[in-house]
Amino acid sequence: MPGNTFGHVFRVTTWGESHGPAVGCTVDGCPAGLPLDVADIQRELDRRRVGQSRVSSQRREADEVQILSGVFEGRTTGTPITMLVYNTDAKSHHYENIKDRYRPGHADYTWDAKYGFRDWRGGGRSSARETIGRVAAGAVARRLLATFGITLVGYTLQLADLRAEVFDEAEIERNIMRCPDARVAALMVERVDQARRELDSLGGIVEVRARGVPPGLGEPVFDKLQADIGKAMFSIPAIKGVEIGEGFGVAMLRGSQNNDPFIRRDDGTIGTVSNHHGGILGGISTGEEIVVRLAAKPPASIAQPQQTVDRDGNPVTIEVHGRHDPTVLPRLVPVAEAMLALVLADHLLRQRLARVTWEDRSDD
């Protein structure tokens, strides 16, 4: 089964299933000498962990990461970094009575259509639990980016029709919705509680920003920076739409409105007055803030009766019980940050291979 590896230079392979013994990843291509501690990875995994609030799945997992290779005495060795998280609270019996019934909105049918055989326990490889490996790898990428002054911040921008109206970065980790608007965050929690009582779920939008990205990252023509960002984000379970900068809003603008005038800043660097382009032009970073938005569908696992068919095509009714997220948004935030970090780390290393300057050459 191909498709488990992401990146060109900074390469990440994830592995494992939702109800298997463990999940994890291997990072290859990380330079040697990068300071890295298990706490760096655990911090990000804790943000993604299930059961952390009433707006997430009540599955109880510690998600304690183990670094098996690639790190010695607190620094990366330049060899593959393998990280592992054991699954300790899988309850496969919740799926016994529906294993031959196709859950609406899930990948059950499509995986059967492709492989003719699938792990039906909790969605197997198609489960969002696979994203543990992404978040662990993203934590390594973030440490690398930090050495170049690049930082990322993600947050819940919108839940259903409730949209943040204020951006207070300090507020993001203070509320369980990870929303930068405290007032709207409280309304979001109430809406999620209502959906849970009604045995339903809610979608929304997560936004991620990257700051300090130097100009010049991106590989024309088919590996444009926004193309790789789009692939990264669309590979996350539940994502149905991705925007960069003004996104679909550009359809309503004139060129005179959408163009961002260039200026020379006081420090001598080139920048733009506005940022409709979201930090990318021609597939290459401009040095402005990179702004990405992801539209997430409502989680497909709901306990309402739904019409479907079984593997033989017979009409049946299904109710999906178990421990499921009423919305993915708060736990999606660290996953989206991780995927953007992986793209930027990969392109940062690729850029260092793109050209040789006279300053890079040593005297003979």
UniProtKB/Swiss-Prot annotation:
Pathway the protein takes part in: Metabolic intermediate biosynthesis; chorismate biosynthesis; chorismate from D-erythrose 4-phosphate and phosphoenolpyruvate: step 7/7
Name used for this protein in its record: Chorismate synthase
Protein family: Belongs to the chorismate synthase family.
Main function: This reaction introduces a second double bond into the aromatic ring system.
Assembly, per entry: Homotetramer.
Assigned GO CC terms: cytosol
Gene Ontology BP terms: amino acid biosynthetic process; aromatic amino acid family biosynthetic process; chorismate biosynthetic process
GO molecular function term, any single one: FMN binding
Enzyme Commission code(s) on record: 4.2.3.5
Keywords: Amino-acid biosynthesis, Aromatic amino acid biosynthesis, FAD, Flavoprotein, FMN, Lyase, NADP
Sites where the protein binds FMN: R125, S126, S127, G282, K297, P298, P299, A300, S301, R323
Catalytic activity: 5-O-(1-carboxyvinyl)-3-phosphoshikimate = chorismate + phosphate
Top EC class for this record: lyase
Positions annotated to bind NADP(+): R48, R54
Cofactor binding annotation: Reduced FMN (FMNH(2)).
UniProt xrefs under InterPro entries: Chorismate_synth, Chorismate_synth_AroC_sf, Chorismate_synthase_CS
Matches recorded under Pfam families: Chorismate_synt
